[in-house]
Each structure stands twice: as structure tokens, then as C-alpha cells.
């Protein structure tokens, strides 16, 4: 007789590019989100929780022109109805695209301007790498329906407050601001957007090479090239603005093929940051010359700087920096990026700046996809996981998660008494649990408490019960004594105390307070 086939067991493993989070990681993220939400709420923003699933049509971004729209997103097609094919659905890849759909769908019921914040996981169907996962948290705040740059200034100020609220000290970060309109002015100057170059006197000597218009494809190459400034550096960008560059493997990446004069103008824009915001603005005005859109962008930066200064957000926290180019192909006006300025050791032991932890800007075209009308909007997205990594790197987060007080079980028949103890502790706001494993071996109960990183264990056997007392073991002090104390010190610093049963809560609270754990 043939043996029945065994049912194959599934592999217990996470999918590639995903990970699980435990204990302290979850608690620390929740606390950080709560602190950021507190700042958003203080600024008058309302919470929004939208669906994690959107139609592919509503998302609209990262989607290739192919039958299955799954590049960049996790997408699937619903079953077809009798009269039409099933809709394509996808997990959201950010929190901004859902906001555009929500505003377009509910705009008649929402205040104008609409100020909202949202927090939650997003999913990207991209190649994972070290520290780069396919699911991660975003924490956004946006104002929809306000065209004034006062909304952009407010977002920048709020971003500063958020960073300080989670433990990033002033001096350890800087919020850098640029404006897509200024870049448009630069492109206009070099013949990308206008029929004739409009140069300031400083650039008149370049005029003979600036007259021809560039194609839209070439403009796209220019935008993608300057977006790589952080990765390639100035010389790498200069090469890609010209004929191209070879990477370390020798492969050639074709460039925008600009003339030297055109490249010089673009590089002057990227290098226009002066010693003060005022100097930077002067440099930018000279570069954009008589370009209307360029001048408008510089004026907006100047106004933002004035508004921030009025609120005591000076250049020690927020600076105008034309080298902020990330996302300029997406945004339509001011852009901003929060960068941590302190140094850390990377995985290979090399010293480097931590880098960007938040970014945002003005995107006046996003809602237009749904309504056909331009709706001004501006906002910021904070990378919560990167912020947590930064605080870990600075040693400002305790990597251990303090466990609950453990009430041990010395007598199975008296479980009700132990439950009464733990109930009293919980009612006093103290995290506590009864040991629910096999109580036969008391040593295993203490090992369990150690595994849980418990600060205190409560012990009450038959003798203690008759006397009306409990034994309270300070596990933190006990561990310290076990590491270094002599016998005499151990006698002088006992880590276990006998107290009347009625004083259980008071004694536990006293021990927690001694270790800075009482809240």
C-alpha cells in the first residue's frame, strides 16, 4: 500500500524586500509618529486616513505604457464583469497621489484651503537593497487650495518643529529651499523654453551659443541630470550636461549635449549659493536675467525667506540653496529638503553625512488630472524610518524595550490572587503580566522575565501569602550587582525586598522611579 503524500509545508520567510518589526522598533516608531502628529495638529492640520489600495488610474504615476501596469507599484486586475474588464488596482506608492484623489472626490465637503496630514505604510515594487525595503512608512502634511507662498513657508517652519520634536537638535539639521521656477528661468536663458535667450550682462559673452531651442527630450535629460547632483557630484553632472560620461565599468551614458556656454549657465545656477540668503538671491537674479518665470521664482524665494525670518526661523535652520534639485522634474514651484548635518559611520566604517530625511514642495498640477482645473498644493513627506536610523546613529534612542513587571506563579491554585495583583498594577498605569507558562520550574519564570527585559518580578508563595507579604525583585539592580559587585556590596545593596501585600504597587512604582521608568 502506497504511503500517503505529505502535504508540503510553506516556508516561514518574509518576501524579498520586506521585513518584520518587533518590540522597541514598533514602539519607537509609534512614539515618533505621535510626536510629529502633535506638531501637525498644533499647526491646524487635520488627520486623513485613506485606503491603502487605489485604482491604477487614480495613482497615475510609475505606470508603463504596457498591458500590465505594474512597474513601480504592486498591481493586480480584478475579475471582469459581464460587460467590462476588471479594474486595475494597486497598493499606494506614496500618500500624495491618494490625497489628490480624495480632494477631487470630496472637494465640495472639504474646507478650502484643506490642510491634512497622513501617516502610514506605502509600497514600491522596486529592487530592494541595503536599508531599502518595498514597504516603508511615510508621514506627510499638505495644504491644498492655497496659492500663496505663505503656505510653503509654513510647511518649512513646521518641518523644523517636527525634527526638533523627535529629538534632532538645532544645529544638527538644515532645511534647504529652492524653486523650480528659477530652474525654468535658467532653462529659458539657455534656449530650452524660450525662442530667444535672455541673459544678464554677466552672461552676455556666452550669447552666441545660446540661441537654439532644445527639444523636450533634451530638457528631460537636463532635469534628470541635475537631479543626480548628490550622487555624481558637480563634475559628473557637467559631463552629463555635455556629450556624456563613462561610469566605473566603462559604460557610456549619453548626455544632453549642451554647449559649453549652456553648461556654464546651468552650473552657475547649481553653484549660486552665497554666504547669506541675500547673497544667494542676488546671484540667482543675475543668472535668470530678464526671464519672467525665473524672476518670479526668485521673488517667491525672497518672500519665503522674509516670512520665515518673521517667525524666527533664520538661516541657522533654513537656507536658500539652488543645489537642492531632487524632484525638480515633479514640483512646480518651491521645493525643500531637510538634511541632517552630523556625521555617522556607514556599514563599511566610512565617515559620511547622514543626509536627507524629508522633502517636499509645491505641486499645482496633481489635482488637475481629476478636475481639469489647476488646484494649488504644497506639502512635505518625512522619512520616519530614516529619522529613526539617524537617532540610533546619534545614540539618542534606547535600543532596548523595557518589558512588563512579571508576577510569578508559585501556586497554580492561587491564580486568582496573582491576577488580582496584576490588575492592581495595571490600574495604577504600570505595565504588568502574569506568567502563563508552565510554573513548575521557578528558574524558568525568572529566565522568562529576563528575556522580556522586565524591570521587576513579583513573588508570592504560600509562606508569603500567610504572612500577608510579597517579595519584589529588582531585576535591573540584580543584573548590575551580578556583573560587578563584591559579596560585601551585594549584602549592602539587596535587590529583593519583602513588603506588605498592600504596598505592592507603591514599592514597584518606587523601583521603577529609581531606574527612570516611572511615567
Curated annotation (Swiss-Prot):
GO CC terms in record: cytoplasm
Transmembrane parts of this sequence: none
Reactions this protein catalyses: tRNA(His) + L-histidine + ATP = L-histidyl-tRNA(His) + AMP + diphosphate + H(+)
Coiled coil: none
UniProt keyword Nucleus present: no
Gene Ontology terms for molecular function: ATP binding; histidine-tRNA ligase activity
Group of enzyme by EC: ligase
PROSITE patterns per record: AA_TRNA_LIGASE_II
Classification via SUPFAM superfamilies: Class II aaRS ABD-related (SSF52954), Class II aaRS and biotin synthetases (SSF55681)
Keywords: Aminoacyl-tRNA synthetase, ATP-binding, Cytoplasm, Ligase, Nucleotide-binding, Protein biosynthesis
Biological processes, Gene Ontology terms: histidyl-tRNA aminoacylation
Assembly information from the UniProt record: Homodimer.
UniProt family annotation: Belongs to the class-II aminoacyl-tRNA synthetase family.
HAMAP family reported for this sequence: His_tRNA_synth
Protein name from the UniProt record: Histidine--tRNA ligase
Gene that produces this protein: hisS
